[in-house]
Amino acid sequence: MGDISKHNIFSLPEDILAKLELREEYSVEEKTDSANLSNQGDIVDSTQKNISSCVNCQIDNLHTLDERKSHIKSDWHRFNTKRKITKLPPVSQDEFESIIEDLPESLSGSESETNSESEEDNFQIEKAFKQSLNIGKVDSADENNNQRTNSPLTWFQLSNASAEVPTYIGVYKHMFSGNNHITKDLLVQQQNHNRQKPLQLAMFMVGGGHFAAMIASNEFNPRDPHVPKVLAQKTIHRYTTRRKQGGSQGAADNTKGNIHSAGSGLRRYNEQALIKDIQQVFKDWGKLLETCDLIFVRAIGSSNRSIFFSQPGALISPKDPKLRVFPFTTKRATHSELLRCYKELVTPKISHVDSISIKAQEEERKRQAEIEKEIRQSRLQEEERKKKKLAKYTEVIISNLKASNIEAFLEYLRSNDLSINFQFYPKNVHLHTSTPLHYAVTQKNAKLVAKLLRNGADPAMLNGNGKTPFEISTGNKEVKDEFLIARHELGESFFDWEAAKVGAPQSREQIQKQRQKAKTKLENQRRDKERQEELRRKEAMQKIEEQSKRDYDKLHGEGHSLGINNVRKVDELQSLSPEMRMRIEREKRAAAAMKRMQTK
């Protein structure tokens, strides 16, 4: 087995090729335990713990220690770790790339691996994680499907009668034309063809302002068959990602519109410059690309994919049969990463697992999946019951408060072990009145507010709009006064009155004096107004009587009146209030009646 690791998949020895037998059930269902996969050919006991798999991501193709370290530092692994903490199922790499489609540019950085834990990357993982919470639950049919059903590997068994545990050799389908069905004949045919004309590959990666490209030949290298002959290579880096916020400037512009700043302008310029630089690489490598047998591209996100497939005169078509994606986790777009990916693609994978262990472990996976499914369903049912119970609590509490039945309210809290600061549910319905104290304030019930405060209702609690009860009591002076009185009587240490935005403390006597003073002031103002109205009434009556006398004299004396005095009289009446005019009219009618009686 040690000899196999010294070759790549296109330079396997003839004696090894002769002993290979395609394992259909192995390659289709991918039942291998990758704890036993090794590029070095070390035989591992099938009972040992699976150290080459990742439980968080549910993969088991981590063949070496370096690959395991690399995977642990990858954004995909960190993302699934966050999901596991919150009891959510992991996502596949394709799902992860779909989630971060509009965010991914900032997930790629420099070649330094220490940068993978940078503040920008952490922010992006957090952003992608929050976005993933909007993804619906996986249906049961999908849960039953093993994510390795469409495995990128095809497995061959190495027939060896003397071996107690069978040996399997895996090759990536992506390295063959028509990669859906790889046979032994195709593997032998490809090896013969590779000797005559070495396989030529083009590899491209772009993301986060980083671009790496390489055209390599699988020409035999006697020193290391896993190292290609590099025909051309290019790396480019441009500042295009938004620090802290994350994502590309173009994605931000599409969402929020153009932002005018020095940094945004520079990023827009660099995005266009990066596209031009990549197009120039394609133009310079045009003839080499035509001779390539396979083209591997990693371009996550619509903006990155458009660089390869949507630009004028694009040399790569999305329907090109030579086009491939990398069938494993990749890191930042650097030349060393391209070399690592090449080595991963051409290195045969070796597994020492017996069929009994495979079936047992597969059954264990299915059993664990069923258990996890039951746990998720149970958790959902429990959450639904909890929501209904909270809604019922809210309904009863509001009913008691509305009736000002504080005793029934407190008894209900005690019997159901609820806090007096109980948060009403659902929160989106009770944004303004989130707690009993908020509700009592909106009901303008000062007595209820006073009782709630003295029973421990916290005035510093915020409602759904971020307001304290005191802040929403601005329309009722009596309710506001109860907060000031409570602050005085309960003391400064009873609640955080400053956080509650409650004003300076005042005693009930002070409040009553203020109310009495205000009441006296209003009463005095009312009396002053009545005195002024009475004075105006008397003056108006006097003027009317005098005018009536003059009118009578003129009516029975010389000449006839032109009615000017009547106009003046009407004007004077118009200046009075409606009540005063009515009183004057009644008195005028009474005076006229008396005069008629005297003349008879």
Curated annotation (Swiss-Prot):
GO terms for molecular function: endonuclease activity. ANK repeats lie at residues 432-461, 465-492. Gene3D superfamilies: Ankyrin repeat-containing domain (1.25.40.20). Keywords: ANK repeat, Coiled coil, Cytoplasm, Endonuclease, Endoplasmic reticulum, Hydrolase, Membrane, Mitochondrion, Nuclease, Phosphoprotein, Repeat. Residues 520-559 have a biased composition (Basic and acidic residues). InterPro entries: Ankyrin_rpt (IPR002110), Ankyrin_rpt-contain_sf (IPR036770), ANKZ1/VMS1 (IPR047139), VLRF1/Vms1 (IPR041175). It is a peripheral membrane protein. Transmembrane segments: none annotated. Residues 239-263, 517-563 are annotated as: Disordered. SMART domains: ANK (SM00248). Pfam families: Ank_5, bVLRF1. The active site is at 249. It is found in: Cytoplasm; Mitochondrion; Endoplasmic reticulum membrane. Residues 359-392, 506-550 form a coiled coil. The keyword Hydrolase applies. The keyword Repeat applies. The VLRF1 domain mediates binding to the 60S ribosomal subunit. Belongs to the ANKZF1/VMS1 family. This is tRNA endonuclease vms1.
